[in-house]
Amino acid sequence: MTTQNFLVEIGTEELPPKALKTLATSFADNVEAELNQAGLTFDKIEWFAAPRRLAVKVLNLAKQQPSKEIEKRGPAVSAAFDAEGKPTKAAEGWARGCGITVEQAERIATDKGEWLVHRAKIEGQPTKNLLNDIVANALAKLPIPKPMRWADKTVQFIRPVHTVTMLLGDELIEGEILGVASARTIRGHRFLGEKEFDIQHADQYPQLLRDKGSVVADFNERKAEILAKSQAKATALGGVADIEESLLEEVTSLVEYPNVLAAKFEERFLAVPAEALVYTMKGDQKYFPIYDKDGRLLPHFIFVSNINPEDPTAIIEGNEKVVRPRLTDAEFFFKTDLKQKLVDRLPRLETVLFQQQLGTLKDKTDRIEQLAGEIAKQIGTDEAKAKRAGLLSKCDLMTNMVFEFTDTQGVMGMHYARHDGEDEEVAVALNEQYMPRFAGDELPKSLVASAVALADKFDTLTGIFGIGQAPKGSADPFALRRAALGALRIIVEKNLPLDLEDLVKKSAALFGDKLTNQNVVADVVDFMLGRFRAWYQDEGIEVDVIQAVLARRPTRPADFDARVRAVSHFRTLDSAEALAAANKRVSNILAKADAAIGEINLTVCVEQAEKALAEAVLALRTEVQPLIAQGDYTTVLDKLANLRAPVDSFFDNVMVNAEDPALRQNRLAILNTLQGLFLQVADISVLQ
C-alpha cells in the first residue's frame, strides 16, 4: 500500500471555547502547508475539535516522499578560474557548499556565457520520519496570543497537554510533541464512557472515541446536533429558538457530548424588557431564549449539558436555580430605574468623563443635541425630535440596568423613554443611535434616529481626530473605523443629501477651543473616504475603480457611491480600456502644456479628425450637464463611451504639438475639454 491515513490528536485541558474552532482550522491548515512543503501528496484533510482535544486526520497520505532533482548554479566559468586555470576562492566556496569539488561540477552554456552547475538527486524519505517535525511545526504556528507553561516543563501551549497520538495507518509514529511522547492512549469524556483507552489504527478515529469515550470529536457534527435538537425543543414548546451563530459555536466548544434540554423561569420576569433577560441568558448562562410566533419572549429557555443522565430533572432544576438570581437582579434594576425619569439623569452625565480633553458625557450630549438638529434640517426630518433624542441619548448609561448589563445601552433607553411618555420616534432613536453596531448590522429605520446616530458618530470622529489621536495600525480604542463606516452606510444606503466636509466643520465648531489639530476637517474627511475603499473592496469592486473616484475626492457619500457604481459599470464596456488609455495619454500631454489653455475654436480646426472630436466633445458637454446635476453618472459615462472612435481617429491623424501656436493651443483645448468631461465623474486614466 503506497498511502495510509494519518491521525494526530493533541489531548489537553479545557481549551478556550471562543478560540477552539480557529485553533482547529489553523492546525489543519498548517498541517496541510507543511505536507505540501515536504512534497507529500494526500487526498483530503479533516479536522476535529472538542473542549479537551485538537485532531487532524489526513486521508490517503503518501507513505514515501518523492525523490527530487536539484540544480545549484555557481559562478560563471570566467570567474571560477584564474589566469592559470586554477579555481578561484569563489568557485571553491560554492563547491564546498554543494559538498563537491570544483572539478566535479558540471558546466552549462547560456546566452550569457558558461556557468558551473551542480546537479544532484535527493532521495525522498519515508513519510513516518517526517511527521513528527510536520506536526511540531504546525502547532508552533498556531495563533496563540498568550501561551502558558505548566508543571516543570519549558514548552508552551495554549493549555497544558496530556496526551499525544500520531498514527500512520496502524503504525505509531514515535516522537515527542510539546514535551509529551506519542502514544496510542487517548482520553474519553471526563464523566461519561471510558476515561482512557488505546487506539490501534488511524481509521478508528473518530468513531472509537464516540463509542468508547463518549466524545463527539467532530465540531460540525456536534454543532448540527445542538441546532437540530434545540429547534425541536423550541417547537415542542410552541416557539422558536433564538440561536445566534456565535453563541451556537461557543456552546459547541463547551461540550464533548451534547445533551440538549429545556427549562423555564417564572412568568413574572416577562414584565422586564426582553432584551435585559436575553442579555443575561445568552451572555452569562449561554442559554438559547425562545420566542413565540409574534416575537414575544416565552418563559422557557434551552441549554446544552455535557452529561447525559437517565433522569435530567436535577440538571434542569439546577439551571433554573442558577438563572433565577440573575433575572431577579434584572427585575430589581428595572423597577428601581423606573423611579427616575431619563431627563432627570442628565446632571449625572457631568460626573462621567468622555475623554479628558473633550469633556464629560454631558458635554458630548450637548454637542449631539445641536448637531442632530442641524442634520435633521438637512435631511428633512423633525428637528425638535432629533434634538430631544440627542439630549437624552446617553442618559440610560446612568441607570442601574445598563451599569450591570452594559450591552443593553440604547435599548433600555428606549424602554425608559416610553415609560416617561417621550415621543415614540425619540424613544426609538435612543436605541437606534448605535446602529449599525457591527458589519452587516441593520441601519436606523427612522430619519430622526439616523440624525442622532450620525451626530454621535461625527462627534466622536471629529473630537478624537481633533486632539491628534487618529487610529494607528490595528489600535483603534475609540472604534473610529466602525464609526466612520457606520456613518457612511447610513448616508449612502438612505441616500441622504449630506456632505462630509460640512458635517465635520459643524461638529468641530461645537467643540469650541478644545480641538488642537488645525487640519481636523481634512483629516476626518480623508479617513472616511479611506473607509470607502475598504467597504467597496469587500463588495468585490476593483481597487482602480475606487481610486478613479477617490482622485476626484467627492465629499458627499451618496454622490461618491453613485460615481463608483457608474465607473464600475463603465469598466465593463468595450470602449473602456481604450478610453482609459487615451485619458492617460491626454493627462501626460496636458501636464506638459506651458501656457493657459483656453476654449475650443472650431474655426481653427484643420484636420477632419480634430474637428470631429471638437464637435463631439462640445455637443456632449452640453448634453451631459443636466445628467451631472442629477447625479446620473452611469448615463454620463455611457454617452462619453461613444467618444472612442473620434478619440482614436484624433490620435491617429492629428499632431497635437503643431508648430502653429494657435493650432497647438486649440488642440490642447480639445483634449482639455475631453478630459474635463470624464473628470466630472472620475479620473478614468487610473483604470488598469
Swiss-Prot record:
UniProt lineage: Bacteria, Pseudomonadati, Pseudomonadota, Gammaproteobacteria, Pasteurellales
A cellular component term, taken from the record's GO annotations: cytosol
EC number: 6.1.1.14
Protein name: Glycine--tRNA ligase beta subunit
HAMAP family: Gly_tRNA_synth_beta
GO MF, one example: ATP binding
Annotated source species: Haemophilus influenzae (strain PittGG)
PROSITE patterns with a match to the protein in the record: AA_TRNA_LIGASE_II_GLYAB (PS50861)
Main location: cytoplasm
Keyword Nucleotide-binding: yes
Family, per entry: Belongs to the class-II aminoacyl-tRNA synthetase family.
Subcellular location: Cytoplasm
Protein's UniProt keywords contain Zinc: no
Reaction(s) this enzyme catalyzes, per UniProt: tRNA(Gly) + glycine + ATP = glycyl-tRNA(Gly) + AMP + diphosphate
Oligomer and partners: Tetramer of two alpha and two beta subunits.
Keywords tagged on the record: Aminoacyl-tRNA synthetase, ATP-binding, Cytoplasm, Ligase, Nucleotide-binding, Protein biosynthesis
Record-level GO BP terms: arginyl-tRNA aminoacylation; glycyl-tRNA aminoacylation
InterPro entries noted in UniProt: DALR_anticod-bd (IPR008909), Gly-tRNA-synth_bsu (IPR015944), Gly-tRNA-synth_heterodimer (IPR006194)
Pfam families per record: DALR_1, tRNA_synt_2f
